[in-house]
Amino acid sequence: MTVDQNAAAEPKEECRSVRILVVDDNPAVRHYLRALLEQQATWKVSDEARTGAEAIQRVTKNPPDMVLLDFQMPDLNGLDVARKISGLFPEIPILMVTIHLSKQLTDECRRAGVRGACAKSDVGSIVEAVDTLLHAGTYFPAMSSAER
């Protein structure tokens, strides 16, 4: 048996974790999103924020690879936070997660620099949206006339 010395000496490519900031004022929702995201081998919730101001501060201090952002928070709404983050760090994809998904909100999200939006209750959409955004895509589900 022969061993290829060059093959043995080659460094293995490391799988770098994708660092995700989860922003939601509800601790139960943050826990749910963390559990959902960390089922993926290379996705890691690197930080959490409870308010819009806290999210902006955390992104500025230690920019993540992606932001999952709640729309409705006590201080700033998700659109205001998204505008600020995308203005400072346009390369960071932002996914708006909300219980109030509508055609109007998705249009406003696009204008605010958000690259995707989905309902918090749709587990499959959240995973699909994160994956799409991490591969430089956008994710805005089609809205039926009843949802507009």
Which residues make up each language-model segment?
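Non-catalytic signal-transmission and effector/linker regions of two-component phosphorelay proteins
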Residues: 1-19, 127-148
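Conserved acidic segment of CheY-like receiver
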Residues: 16-29, 33-37
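Active-site residues of response regulator receiver
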Residues: 24, 70, 98
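Acidic catalytic/metal-coordinating carboxylates
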Residues: 51-54, 77-80
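Active-site beta3 strand of CheY-like receiver
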Residues: 62-68
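The feature encodes the CheY-like receiver
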Residues: 74
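Alpha4 helix (beta4-alpha4-beta5 surface) of REC/receiver domains from two-component response regulators
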Residues: 80, 101-118, 124-128
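A short, hydrophobic beta-strand element within the central beta-sheet of small alpha/beta folds
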Residues: 91-102
